[in-house]
Every structure is written in C-alpha cells, then in structure tokens.
C-alpha cells in the first residue's frame, strides 16, 4: 500500500514546460497525507495549475472557465426526497384503487391541455390524491430548480430566508422543495403555507412534510446521539414506515410549517413562492395578474425575494411577462440599461413622468429582476395577449420557457402504467420500428419539466441604499449596451441561453436574451478560441453565457403586434356573430313552441317541451325563456 502511494510523490511528477516559470506555492507532503486512510491525496480538492482551489466539483467542471462554471444552471438530475416518495406511495396512493386515480388524473390532464387553460384548486378528495400522483412532481421540480437558481445568483451564504410564504394548490410544494435545498438543519423563524382548494390537501401536506427532518418540532440539539445510535434509529424508523401502509392519523402530526387556507394581508416575508397563483380566470387577463402581483409585493420584506412559477406554455409565459412589465415599467425607462432597481409604483399610472419624479412615487420601495432576464428593458418576446398564440399565424410566435429532467418515483411510475396514461410512440427513427409500443418510452424512469419562472428582489430601504440607487440612475453609469455586449461583465447581466445550443462540427450557435434588451444569435467557432469553444459545447438552455463569440448578430426582428390585434378583433367579431345566430335560433324555436301550444294538443307539458328544446339549443334557450 505504501509503495503504491509513494509512487506518485512530487519528485516523480513531470511538469510541462509552460508551468516551470510559475511561482507555485511550496507544498508540504504532510498536507496531502490522510492520517485515517494512511494514504496520500495528491489534490484533496479541485485546483487550478497554481494549486488554488476552484468552484469545480469534478474533473469535467475543472476544464471549464470559472465564469462559465459560475453561469451554469443547476446540472444534477432532480429527484424527490426518498422518504417523501415512500410516504406518498404507502400512505396516500395505497388507499386507492389505481385505476380510479388514473381516471381522475387523465381527466385533469385533458382539461389543462386545452388552449390557454389554467391550473385550478382540487374539488374532491379523489382529485387531491390524483393531483399529488400526477402534478405534484412537476411542480416540485420547477420550484426546486428555480430556487437553486436564486441560491446561486445571490450566493449560498446569503440565501437563508427566515420568513417564508408558499402559496399554491398542492401540499405545500414550495416548502417541501425549500427544505430539501437548505438541508435538515435549516430552521427559520416562520414558515407559512397557503393551500387553496379542498381541505384534504392540508392533511396530505402534513404527511409529506412530516418526513423532512427540519419539520420536526422541539428537537434537542444538545443531546446528540452517536453515529451508531443514529444509524440504528434510522433503520428502526424505516422499518416502522415500511410496515405501516394505509391511512395516517394526521391530527397527531405536528410540523413546523403553519398550514393556512387564506392569504395573509399584513405580514412581511423574506421569501414568497407563488405557484400558478397570478391568474385564476383566463377572461380576467391582465387585470387579475396586476391585482395579485400588487398584493404579494405589498407583503414582501426589504431585501426579500419573490419567486413566480407558471406553466411553460404561452399562457404561462404571458402571465410572467405581464407581471414583469407591471413591476419594472420598462416603457418609463427607454434609455436605461443594466439592472438598476426600479421604483414600484403600486399600480399608479406613471406614464410621461420623468425618471427623477418616479422616485417620489414610492421613495423606499425598489425592485430588480434576478432571473431569468439579463436586462430590465421590454421583453422582446412579449405580445401582451395569450389569445394571439391560438391564431394560425401565431403558431410561429416564440416564448420563454425552460426544461429540466426529474426522476420518477415509484408512485409516478405506477400511475402511468396501463392504457389510460400510456403514451403511444412509433419508434420511426432509424431502424427502431420494432420498438413500437405504448407506455414509458424505452422504459425510461424520468420525465421532462416544462415551466416559466421569474424572480424579483426588493432592495433594502436604508438611507445608504436609496442614495446609491438614486446616484446610479442619475449618472446612468451603464450607458448603452450594444449587440454583442456582456453588460457589466458580471452574472448580473450576462446573456442567458433561451434555446438549446445548436452544436455542429467546428462551431456552436446559441440564441441568447442579451443585456441589450434584444434576442441575439452568437456563433462560437473552434478557430475563435479552443477553450471558449469547449465551454460552448458544454452549455445548455438556461445557462448564462459569460464569454465572447466570433459572430454576434440580432436574432429576431420586431414583432408585428398590430397584425395580431387585427386578427383578435376579427375573432371576437366572429364569436359575437355566432352568439347572435345561436340566440336567433333559440328565439325561432321559442316562437314555434308558443304557436304549437296554442293550436295543437301535446302530450307534454310546457315545461317538458322547453326542457327538450333546451337540450338542442343549450343554456341560451333557457336564458331566453327566463328573460321572456
């Protein structure tokens, strides 16, 4: 053993000539000896050529530039906490006949596949459990990935919120994800979870949260057991959980999170997580979005963050874009670049006011966007109306969303067995026609999340911070960011990759949302830089890009929104015409009914005849009869 270890002593290591001129720090052999394993660790942590520690956690990351590594989004495949997964499988799913859950989940999937559909609260106990079996995993992964992005941008040491509010239709999904990110020792001052819908969802939240260590009440940190005792306790606990399959008496479960059914109006929170909560009625867009975002911003504490999660479809993106527009007011700052915190006007119309006057509207409330936007100018993809995407001409409209892979736990795999939720696939690629079938394609145990998100940060309201914001705005220190700019060359304004990079032999093409406020297309070739080319081939959608490129051009022309406004007016006109025709037919049927009742003998009563006619003409006929 010792012979093998000492075969890699420093004097036997040959250095390249390019390193001989470097002033390497003097390394002592004792620094590399592990006294427990009696061996030698040549490099105990990943270091660069000067033996300085880096952010890399493996050899692949070590090859990347430090800026590239800093701009990467969370890479690991997401996976639900095994204890939570086991509790869902044993204590929630096990009490139902599987096909009953599949049938309810199938109906809900069909419902949300309709154009511009929205998530809604669960109405029955069966819908509650079907939601957990089908939708919970998607929401968990979307929130987890968004919170990891927030944690990376503000720094792990600065991401320790003490007052948290989670609002959603699920079993406190945001709290579950936050607990997994910050670990078992995370015990903040306040955690509120607002669960809208059927009261049974709160009972399910108790079961799920009780499987996380940081939800245990009255833990005694002083009397810490030995490692062997902890291992024994853990095995006994797992054995007991494996034995118990069925319903749980939730009244005896105590957790740290406060479960609520109403949204607070007076408290302040350091972190607010909103999952599908800005719009509940598609016909109320955008008024309802404005009202809801205003309410939640009013309870956001100085220095706090608000995380908005929506579906990764056109409706979800337009909700996000509207919340961004009403908060940042980019139309009032046409000449401003960078991420100078913007004054929140609380719904007051400020069009036409000068920048100096805007600070007086709300002198101590300023907001800036953390992610995913690298700028605070008008969103280049926003069209302002989700209905535009339903037109034939609107199918080519692009929108901003992100994807992430998450491993399916046992309950999710079991749910999607059988014919109800099986996905047909033909295996037409290559010579794979023999693989034609249904179910989980190739037996894969993961699914792809599809979501849109937005993260705001409220600035502190101390005097020094407010003076600094005013100074930055008055001096306009950032100037103008042209096409191809990296902004201030920090992660605050690096361009973000919004489509999967196109990787070809010798070059990589990337679509970026850039600090210039435009969509740009950058091309990185091997001849430009081997290191940057290597990093570009490792990039993914959702990353920040921190290096230059060989070619940088504007990627998308200005949207012709006027054309879609005209199409939308024609669509509304056609809908009104159809409604008038339907009402006219109902009127004619009613008149015929009156005539027949006056001159003919019928075996049906008036009410029965009207009821029969209503089956042909719908509610419009009954409404007309009531008006009559």
Swiss-Prot record:
Keywords: Iron, Iron-sulfur, Metal-binding, Mitochondrion, Transit peptide. The keyword Transit peptide applies. Its main location: mitochondrion. GO terms for cellular component: mitochondrial small ribosomal subunit; mitochondrion. Residues 1-15 form a transit peptide. [4Fe-4S] cluster binds at residues 373, 379, 400, 513. It is found in: Mitochondrion. Pfam families: Rsm22 (PF09243). One of its GO terms (biological process) is mitochondrial translation. One of its GO terms (molecular function) is structural constituent of ribosome. Mitochondrial ribosome (mitoribosome) assembly factor. Binds at the interface of the head and body domains of the mitochondrial small ribosomal subunit (mt-SSU), occluding the mRNA channel and preventing compaction of the head domain towards the body. Probable inactive methyltransferase: retains the characteristic folding and ability to bind S-adenosyl-L-methionine, but it probably lost its methyltransferase activity. Present with 1900 molecules/cell in log phase SD medium. Associates with the mitochondrial ribosome (mitoribosome). Only transiently interacts with the mitoribosome. Belongs to the methyltransferase superfamily. Rsm22 family. This is Ribosome assembly protein RSM22, mitochondrial. It comes from Saccharomyces cerevisiae (strain ATCC 204508 / S288c) (Baker's yeast).
């Amino acid at each position: 053993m010792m012979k093998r270890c000492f075969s890699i002593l420093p004097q036997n290591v040959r250095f390249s000539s390019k390193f001989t001129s470097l002033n390497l720090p003097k390394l002592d052999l004792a620094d590399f000896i592990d006294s427990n394993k009696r061996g030698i660790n040549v490099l105990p942590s990943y270091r660069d050529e000067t033996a300085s520690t880096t952010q890399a956690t493996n050899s692949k990351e070590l090859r990347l530039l430090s800026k590239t590594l800093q701009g990467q989004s969370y890479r690991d495949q997401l996976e639900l906490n095994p204890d939570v997964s086991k509790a869902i499988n044993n204590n929630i799913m096990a009490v139902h006949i599987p096909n009953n859950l599949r049938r309810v989940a199938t109906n809900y999937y069909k419902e949300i596949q309709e154009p511009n559909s929205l998530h809604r609260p669960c109405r029955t106990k069966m819908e509650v459990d079907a939601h957990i079996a089908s939708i919970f995993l998607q929401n968990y992964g979307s929130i987890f990935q968004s919170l990891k992005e927030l944690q990376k941008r503000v720094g792990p040491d600065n991401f320790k919120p003490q007052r948290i509010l989670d609002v959603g239709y699920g079993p406190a999904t945001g709290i579950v994800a936050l607990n997994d990110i910050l670990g078992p020792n995370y015990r903040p001052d306040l955690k509120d979870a607002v669960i809208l819908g059927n009261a049974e969802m709160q009972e399910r939240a108790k079961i799920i949260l009780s499987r996380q260590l940081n939800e245990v009440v009255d833990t005694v940190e002083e009397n810490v057991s030995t490692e062997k005792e902890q291992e024994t306790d853990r095995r006994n606990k797992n054995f007991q959980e494996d034995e118990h399959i069925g319903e749980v008496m939730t009244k005896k479960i105590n957790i740290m999170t406060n479960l609520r059914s109403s949204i607070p109006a007076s408290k302040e929170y350091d972190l607010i997580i909103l999952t599908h909560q800005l719009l509940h009625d598609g016909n109320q867009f955008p008024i309802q979005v404005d009202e809801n975002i205003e309410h939640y911003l009013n309870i956001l504490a100085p220095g706090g963050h608000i995380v908005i999660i929506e579906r990764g479809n056109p409706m979800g993106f337009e909700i996000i874009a509207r919340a961004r527009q009403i908060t940042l007011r980019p139309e009032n700052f046409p000449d401003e670049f960078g991420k100078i915190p913007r004054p929140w006007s609380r719904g007051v119309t400020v069009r036409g006011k000068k920048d100096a006057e805007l600070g007086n509207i709300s002198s101590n409330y300023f907001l800036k966007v953390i992610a995913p936007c690298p700028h605070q100018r008008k969103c280049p993809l926003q069209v302002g109306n989700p209905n535009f995407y339903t037109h034939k001409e609107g199918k080519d409209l692009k929108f901003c969303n992100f994807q992430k892979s998450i491993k399916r736990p046992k309950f999710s795999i079991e749910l999607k067995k059988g014919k109800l939720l099986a996905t047909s696939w033909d295996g037409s690629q290559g010579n794979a026609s023999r693989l034609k079938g249904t179910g989980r394609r190739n037996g894969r145990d993961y699914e792809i999340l599809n979501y849109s998100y937005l993260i705001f940060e409220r600035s502190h309201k101390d005097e020094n911070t407010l003076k600094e914001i005013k100074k930055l705005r008055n001096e306009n220190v950032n100037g103008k960011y042209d096409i191809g700019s990296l902004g201030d060359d920090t992660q605050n304004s690096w361009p973000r990759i919004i489509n999967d990079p196109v990787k070809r032999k010798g070059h990589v093409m990337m679509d970026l949302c850039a600090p210039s406020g435009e969509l740009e297309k950058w091309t990185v070739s091997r001849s430009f830089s081997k290191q940057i080319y290597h990093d570009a081939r490792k990039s993914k959608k959702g990353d920040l890009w921190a290096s230059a490129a060989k070619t940088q051009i504007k990627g998308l022309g200005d949207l012709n929104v006027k054309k879609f406004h005209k199409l939308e007016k024609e669509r509304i006109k056609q809908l009104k015409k159809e409604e008038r025709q339907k009402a006219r037919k109902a009127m004619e049927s009613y008149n015929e009914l009156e005539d027949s009742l006056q001159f003919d003998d019928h075996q049906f009563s008036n009410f029965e005849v009207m009821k029969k006619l209503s089956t042909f003409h719908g509610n419009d006929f009954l409404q007309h009869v009531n008006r009559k």
